[in-house]
Amino acid sequence: MISLNSSSIPSSQTKKVVIGMSGGVDSSVAAWMLKEQGFEVIGLFMKNWEDDDNDEYCSARQDWLDVVSVADMIGIDVEAVNFAAEYRERVFADFLCEYAAGRTPNPDVLCNAEIKFKAFLDHAMSLGADAIATGHYARVRHEGGRVQLLKAVDASKDQSYFLHRLTQQQLSKVMFPLGEIPKTEVRKIAEQIGLHNAKKKDSTGICFIGERPFREFLNRYLPRVPGPIKTPEGKTVGEHMGLAFFTLGQRKGIGLGGSQDGNGDAWYVARKDMANNTLYVAQGHEHPWLLANKLSAVDASWVSGAAPEPGSYSAKTRYRQTDSACTYIADIDTNNFSLSFPEAQWAVTPGQSAVLYDGDICLGGGIIST
């Protein structure tokens, strides 16, 4: 049996754990591990989207059935809770405002901070839980009354990027049973213990909304505002349907071929001029307009509760990106900061998160503004 590291458990008094269960293999194996470790485990399924809850894109109905089946198999109680109102108010409203302003938000970051580790945590505490757990790939280290957020052992699955806005208060009640285990091992465990969802594919859609044609989905909530598509030289090469429907670095769906000026390189979204409703595109993955050696970030959130000392760290400007060496400088008068990189970063995108690391320790981060 795989044992949890003692430093990953909030305290020696932790007995009752409420785990968020999605119906997927990760949270199912995490629940089994907790039960095997002797904790009193309750599974909690969150229903957070209702606008068009159908089986084509949102698998909530089948996911719930999978949760019930797994809970029955491993011998734990399970219940469902509806946080749709909280999700719409705390996450989705911000999501739409950011897109309307021309930025590209990351709803998973806000969903974790506001729903999975706030609304869910509050509900779990009302059930008498000592701690909560999820199937995230990350680690926590409880030492001396403080908590550190660390990368998962499986670097290819590490989700600390999405968790960087969690506070000491939230992390003090959190367990991540899968943080020390490779994803391949999780699949093996699921098969060995006979979980029916052992081969269920991982979800990749927007947090809780599911996998669906994104532009079509966004167009239901934001109006089309057509405008020109121009090159860095100012040549008009097409028309866009609205700046909200494009993101920096985007290659597909621009509506241009690769031969506007006799150059066969692919077109990429390089800039969005909101004031003039103009979409700028550039040819070639390494075009200068797609590269940046510095960024500014706002609304910083630090895991320790305090901004780190200025200096050399590493950072991610998007999920699954390899860490890049950087120099961090805090703005002492605001909750903002800047990062400079010796190696140019590709398609640094306003609205996304810039997350700072000291080795495996996730320090926190902020929202990229420029």
From Swiss-Prot:
The record marks 136, 352 as: Interaction with tRNA. It is an enzyme of class 2 (transferase). GO terms for cellular component: cytoplasm. Residues 106-108 are annotated as: Interaction with target base in tRNA. InterPro entries: MnmA-like, MnmA-like_C, MnmA-like_central, MnmA-like_central_sf, Rhodanese-like_dom, Rossmann-like_a/b/a_fold. ATP binds at residues 20-27, 46, 135. It holds the Pfam family tRNA_Me_trans_M. Disulfide bonds join 111-207. One of its GO terms (biological process) is tRNA wobble position uridine thiolation. This is tRNA-specific 2-thiouridylase MnmA. It comes from Polynucleobacter asymbioticus (strain DSM 18221 / CIP 109841 / QLW-P1DMWA-1) (Polynucleobacter necessarius subsp. asymbioticus).
